[in-house]
Amino acid sequence: MDHSMSKKLHDEALLHIVGGVNSPSRSNKGVGGGIPVTMERANGAYFYDVDGNKYIDYLAAFGPIITGHAHPHITEAITKAAQNGVLYGTPTKHEITFAKMLKEAIPSLEKVRFTNSGTEAVMTTIRVARAYTGRDKIIKFAGCYHGHFDLVLVEAGSGPSTLGIPDSAGVTRSTAEEVITVPFNDLTSFKEALAVWGDQVAAVLVEPIVGNFGMVAPAEGFLEAVNELAHENGSLVIYDEVITAFRFMYGGAQNYLGVIPDLTAMGKIIGGGLPIGAYGGRVDIMEKVAPLGPAYQAGTHAGNPASILSGIACLEVLQEEGLYDRFEKYGSMLKEGIEKAAIKHGIAVTVNQIVGALTVYFTDEPVTNYAEAGATNGDLFGRFFKGMLEEGINLAPSKYEAWFITSAHSEADILETIQAVDTVFGKLVQGK
């Protein structure tokens, strides 16, 4: 494929934008470098770049675009919002409609509040949990990304009984020491952390199904045990459902798995492609939020009509009968096709697939936590990513990210993708 215009634009972007991108995940650093492709437009399941190349898209903007690009119903809602004014700074009736839709879909949301992003939603749930419990520390799980605010940019110390250390320049050690990080799916380490720090732990922050070191499901009984142990300790359980809400069913991963948290943070899908976040939970906890309580949270753009109307429209689309069954069908087809191609070419892969989301790890070992994901072959993934791009398949440029199937993908798209995987695997074994 010709990428000359993408290269020209990236060179120009480097002169004006830090790193040439507005989020590091859009660079190709995670796949061995190279020029990120600059897109011109998107429609349905397809991207079109500035050089005129077409791609089947599984990036889905890192998750929000579950209905495909430029869905007519969502486009109509956004157009209506633009015509009537996109920002008021006052309440609107649409906020009520959307809040009710979220509550009906995810019953643990007894009260909700809108924010501008998933990062803001997670950040505020932690503040509210601290206000409710009077404690300061949180427990999180290694490799789970919860946004770019200081408190969660923390990596594990030397073990579950040690405090976290900064995972980014600019994060202070004192901030990092408010976080205890333990391996996902490891109850022994979780119990040890509670034994050491229990009376200081305000909340346990959990991705109920991990989406940030690939798609990783909880081990049987793990989430139930986390809930029970946290509550015995007087700590709250916060589910970060920024990726998972409405991903696997019309509702949250908590509905899908049947395990209920105290607070939930959401984003991505619920905005229909526009910036949004939301959090909610038990009434007695949510009443700690201003103006009712002492935990302050605000936002100029929070609950703006454009994002709210886009979110309402997205959820209306997701109520289509049989949609999530189709996600499961196509996800299973893709998993099976990738695994067959891998066997054919003698390439070791593990495919973690949950409904319409999956991750291809270059390893013959199961991946159940961050350490196992980190041990997979990143160099081979980088070559695979670039090969797939040349075959017209757009993936996230990182071995830790997921492929997302949208309502716009067709069976023909899935079959074309499987053929591309077969072609690229063939080239990989030839050293190309």
UniProtKB/Swiss-Prot annotation:
GO terms for biological process: protoporphyrinogen IX biosynthetic process. The modification N6-(pyridoxal phosphate)lysine is found at K268. It is found in: Cytoplasm. One of its GO terms (cellular component) is cytoplasm. The keyword Repeat does not apply. Pathway: Porphyrin-containing compound metabolism; protoporphyrin-IX biosynthesis; 5-aminolevulinate from L-glutamyl-tRNA(Glu): step 2/2. Its EC number is 5.4.3.8. This is Glutamate-1-semialdehyde 2,1-aminomutase 2. The gene is hemL2.
